[in-house]
């Protein structure tokens, strides 16, 4: 009887270890994706900032040209 309980306990421990390993692998995968998305987000934010600056420069040129042709 005690051997059966001991074996069931060992089985339970193995099942918990398998689940812990699965969750750990999933967490690592999500962390990798998170890092990649953060890098991409920073790239897009920099690009957006550059494009806003470029748009302001072009708008300024348009104003100067409109004054010239008045």
Curated annotation (Swiss-Prot):
Descriptive protein name: Protein 4.3
Pfam families: DUF5471 (PF17565)
Native species: Escherichia phage T7 (Bacteriophage T7)
InterPro entries per record: DUF5471 (IPR035156)
Top-level taxonomic group: Viruses
Taxonomic lineage: Viruses, Duplodnaviria, Heunggongvirae, Uroviricota, Caudoviricetes
């Amino acid at each position: 009887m005690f051997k059966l309980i001991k074996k069931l306990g060992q089985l339970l421990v193995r099942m918990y270890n398998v689940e812990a390993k699965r969750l750990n692998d999933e967490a690592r995968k999500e962390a990798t994706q998170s890092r990649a998305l953060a890098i991409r987000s920073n790239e897009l934010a920099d690009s957006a900032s550059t494009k806003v600056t470029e748009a302001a420069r072009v708008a300024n040129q348009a104003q100067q040209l409109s004054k010239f042709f008045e």
